[in-house]
Amino acid sequence: MKLIDSLLERNSARGLIEPFPNSDEMEKIYQAALRAPDHAKLKPARFIQISGQGLNKLSSVFYDFAKNELMIEDESILQKYKDAPFRAPMIIILVTKHQEHPKVPLIEQKLSTAASAQNILLALESYGYAGIWRTGKFSFDNKLLKYLNLDDNSTILGYLYVGTRDGDKKKISNYSVDEFVSVWE
């Protein structure tokens, strides 16, 4: 399959099962991630890869954070957060490590991490795997940083849930480019 065809067919996979990429595949996937646009070569993207028993640890982090920081008392909601990491056999937490630079503001560093995430999703597809980028309360609350042993110069941009697509890839129609593109000539 040509690269353009793969790009045109890519979509997020909600249902993910084993297998997930092995360490050799992940090495190449991360190399692809690090090829993302990066003003001044700051390499702000950081990745926390979680699988196996690590999912249990993340489950505890989510539960503790929801209970202690979000002040959630409803056990059914707490259980939902506790179960969240088990929706995929691997999770990659997307982190931007901020660095002071006179020409590269924080937003550019976050955008570089986001581009790295897209490269990861595309590289996963090239190996026959799939993923979905999830965000929410556990992405945008800086109080979670301490639960993940991250410093205050870090921002969580989301979580890539990774594995093998469970079921067929959904078919998505192409969009009319005219709705999104204006041309100046």
Name these PLM-found stretches.
Residues 1-87, 185:
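N-terminal amphipathic, basic helical "cap/leader" segment at the start of enzyme domains
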Residues 3-12, 157-185:
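C-terminal helix-cap and adjacent tail motif
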Residues 144-155:
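Short, electropositive alpha-helical surface patch
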Residues 67, 86-99:
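Acidic-glycine-rich active-site phosphate/pyrophosphate-binding loop
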Residues 52-54, 97-98, 164-167:
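Short loop segments at secondary-structure junctions
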Residues 43-44, 88, 156, 177:
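A generic structural signal for well-ordered coil/turn residues at beta-strand boundaries
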Residues 33, 92, 98, 102-146:
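Small-aliphatic-rich amphipathic alpha-helix that forms the alpha element of a beta-alpha
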